[in-house]
Amino acid sequence: MQKETSLLERVFHLSENGTSVKTEIMAGITTFMTMAYILAVNPAIMSAAGMDKGAVLTATAIAGFLGTVLMAVFSNYPFALAPGMGLNAFFAFTVVKQMGYTWEMALAAVFVEGVIFIVLSLTNVREAIFNAIPLNLKKAVSAGIGLFICFIGLTGAQIIVGNPATKISLFSFKQAMLAGTFHTTGITVVLAILGVLFTAFLMVAKVRGNILWGILFTWILGILCEVTGLYVPDPAHGAFSTLPNLSAGLASFAPASISPLIGELDFSQVATFNFVVVLLAFLFVDIFDTLGTLIGVSSKANMLDDEGRLPRIKGALMADAVATTAGAVLGVSTTTTYVESAAGVSEGGRTGLTAMTVAVLFILSLFLSPFFMAIPAFATAPALITVGFLMFTAVAGIDFTDMTEAIPCYLAIIAMPFAYSIAEGISFGVISYVIINTLAGKTEKISPLMYILAVLFILKYILL
């Protein structure tokens, strides 16, 4: 590879990491395209808590920009951040709608969580947790995340749908034909499958940027189907238009003000029991979702050292902690490291230049939101499904000849898609690893911190 001599080389150490400006930018675009859905989904979820939808969109983009820049600067890793899925739903539907708290109080809980994270990062507690997890279990986390994001892609494209009898099932084209919905949800399933096959072909052919090209190919097919009448948008059934909404003319490109949200934190309930419960729930999910993502993506990118440790992890964890605190002030739920970063890593992203590219695109999205919000779930699904495959290959590195290693790894892997949570997968893996190895008399393999984690996980299931 020709050595980069630019300012970017000096800042991001591109040659040292075996990459180039072109590769990093392409990787950043790919990561952003796979996570751009958050710009549409987060406002929809947070508005259910009574928050201004336009303001949430702007705050989401700014939080994504800020967090991802911090990741690039603090750690020089290709990981992107944004308000986390799952945590936003917990914020809106559990804390606000079910528990009856205001969104201002919920933001205060997120802020306090972020401050605690900063302290934990400064005192190396989060880094110690990362290093305490055994290497085989780290590989299992990577494989489990692969299944998890594949499942996200399959359900997002409605290839897999809910079924009252079997919980989930394949999409039924016959039922869609009979119900007259083939041109809404049915055709999008076809397009998603075509996108997966096209992306897989590009991967086999070793075409650079294959994941990004797969997204664009599927999106363009969707546009062609819509303009020819083969695809008929029906938002009530999750079938949205693939065309940018420019009905407001130039005003369509103006970002909404975040004044209804910024600084609106209510600490009046901070001493109550329920506030502590909410805070602990945010803490648990964010700590282990972030650690799981860092473990999985860095393992796939061969960033871990011989002992399974991630160099410069302290900077990555600090970026995540500061971003959460700042995001709460901006008016969004917990800002966290995105598993979709794996898409950019699969495209060759290895440094903070990938993250910086994502950050720039978050800012551009403020002014080009009609285009980014038009990227449909069926177009990003092929990226998630194929990246899921790439991450699942980490399973080949697990020692399945040792049952004390293999069974906890297996439980961690299957828990992630079935529980729809990276954190729960880590929880299952840690608890089973400690119990099985203790009963097998192999306590020398278990670090003291693993025992502590296992007890905390068990208490979490009892108390939260």
Model-derived regions, located:
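Helix-loop-helix hairpins and the membrane-proximal interhelical loops
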Residues: 2-55, 174, 215-313, 455-459
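Helix-loop-helix junctions within the multi-pass membrane cores of secondary transporters/permeases
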Residues: 3-42, 63, 84-93, 97-145, ...
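Alpha-helical membrane-protein architecture signal
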Residues: 18, 22, 194, 276-280, ...
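Hydrophobic/aromatic residues within the transmembrane alpha-helices of Major Facilitator Superfamily
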Residues: 29-36, 69, 73, 150, ...
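Helix-coil boundary and interhelical linker segments in multi-pass alpha-helical membrane proteins
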Residues: 44-55, 94-105, 273-276, 376, ...
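Loop-to-helix transition at the N-terminal end of transmembrane alpha-helices
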Residues: 50-69
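Juxtamembrane transmembrane-helix boundary signature
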Residues: 64-85, 116
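Membrane-embedded alpha-helical modules
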Residues: 99-220, 356-464
